[in-house]
Amino acid sequence: MSKENFETFIDFGSSKIRIAVFDNYYSKIKFFSEKECLSTFNLENINLTNSKKIIEELIQISEKKIGIHINSVNLMIDTPDLFSIDLSIKKNLEGKKINNNDIKYLLQEAKQLVQNNNFDKKIIHTIIEKFVLDDKIFYTIPEGNPECNYLTLEIKFICFSNIIFNQLSEHLKENHISIENLLCSSYIKSLNYNQLFEKYDKKVFIDIGYRKSSLSIFDKNRLILFNIIPLGGNHITKDISQVLGISEEDSESIKKSLNQTESIFSDDSKKEFISNSKIKNKLKQNISLDLLKKVIHARIDEILNLSLKNINFSSLINDKNKCILVFTGEGSKILDKNSIYLENKFNFFREMNFFEESVSTICQSGYNFNKKNYLYEVNIVSKKLKKNGFFEKLFHFFN
């Protein structure tokens, strides 16, 4: 098979790097793998030192499995400084019928406004939330080219640091790899997982990563809110380390033990899930598990409260029975297995779900995103369309 028959996705996380190669002919995954690797994407301290060898190993393993050289990838990534911008832009049509060129014009104007005021950022996703024709709201392009005085588009842009992007590009070039597309990992994952909960009208996804957490809220298939905060599972590890007076490595071991236990999180169950005798002795000497629970719960509370800050759920959620809260990400595992109870805090949801992710489900989200023409998404990043103008890059949105 030729290179064009395969598509490669790398999910570049702060604690793990995942790779998956998809066979376009059969539309299925051909090979996937992952390796642990600590990287820092903070603008003040970008550290990709450990990842070069890991990426090289993952690429080489993948190439051996598929028998073809890989020279470009779709890069899935989240960073603590990634953010979204909501913008509303209007055009006076003077009672004329709307057409695609009017919409394209407004999209171009909006993109230019965002770019001019955020010159150090790269727009990686553009989502049209609403089409407003005078006082009528539409969530898809109105059929029949109706007449109106004013056409308004409400648009969400997800932006990424140019500095980090350029460093990632140079970093991958050292392995002779170019970036085909840059994708916000937490956004496209929630977009894909959203389809698994179709019986619910309102779906709230909280993805707790290593150094960041993200929030995505959907009204059926429509994204209505996206946000990222610079707090994640590693902050829980550091809290445990400070309170217990042990290394972060030992703290991470305790946290992983809690992730795996089915027992109730209390002093009585201490022997059941802490197998490391060194850590167990330190716990006996320094702190009770009940206090440890409070430390962890305090940080989890902070992550959740900051994620859900300024959201009026009483107006957002009008029917509890049709709402679900879904936790994803490595950092959310500590909430599962009866370790910590959150039901009382989120009693306006009918159900809470701890979605078990894997390399295949994560990278499949990227593949599905590239293959499906999501109704609200405008693709302005594709490298394959680099020579075309902005309007041409919207062809799939209007066809």
Positions of the model-derived regions?
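Nucleotide/phosphate-binding catalytic cleft detector across ATP-hydrolyzing
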Residues: 1-16, 20, 24-72, 77-203, ...
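Conserved blade-register residue in beta-propeller folds
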Residues: 21, 215-217
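Phosphate/oxyanion-binding active-site loops and adjacent basic polyanion-contact surfaces
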Residues: 47-54, 296-303, 362
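Conserved mixed alpha/beta catalytic, RNA-binding, or beta-rich assembly cores of soluble enzyme
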Residues: 195, 202, 206, 215, ...
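Conserved phosphate-binding/catalytic loops in two-lobed NTP-binding clefts
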Residues: 341-369
